[in-house]
A protein has these predicted regions:
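Canonical tetratricopeptide repeat
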Residues: 79, 113-114
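Helix-start (N-cap) detector for alpha-helical repeat units in TPR-like alpha-solenoids
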Residues: 40, 74-75, 108
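Conserved structural position within tetratricopeptide repeats
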Residues: 65-68, 102
Length: 122
């Protein structure tokens, strides 16, 4: 990789015989990051909307897709825990709430602890 400052003071880099202005590379990286963020937020919003509409199975599908692509998404784990809770699936709900809390969002785990949702009923 070779750097060159031209007379117009625009930095360019040479790679494999091609010359690209650095601004185009930065713009491309920014656009890719923006697309990823928009996709992430779209899946999250869709999951939230389905949960609010009491369509827990469909919301769960969207949140599963979100967490498959972005496994460290704290709010995704929290919301998926809520979906499992409303579907009366206590163990997966507790697992997701714990994971969300490990990632910094402890609303679900606080609820589960206060309401004793995640304790064995024995």
């Amino acid at each position: 990789m070779v750097w060159n400052i031209s007379l117009s003071r625009q930095s360019r880099f040479f790679l494999g015989g091609l010359c690209w202005p650095i601004t185009l590379l930065a713009q491309s990286a920014f656009q890719e990051e923006a697309r990823s963020y928009n996709h992430e937020q779209s899946l999250l919003r869709q999951g939230q909307a389905y949960l609010r509409a009491h369509r827990y199975e469909v919301g769960l599908e969207k949140l599963n897709q979100l967490l498959l692509e972005f496994p460290e998404h704290a709010q995704g784990h929290y919301l998926r825990g809520n979906a499992y809770y409303y579907l009366k699936q206590r163990e997966p709900a507790c697992t997701d709430w714990r994971k969300a809390c490990d990632l910094g969002q402890c609303y679900g785990w606080t609820f589960a602890t206060f309401e004793r949702v995640c304790e064995d009923p024995s």
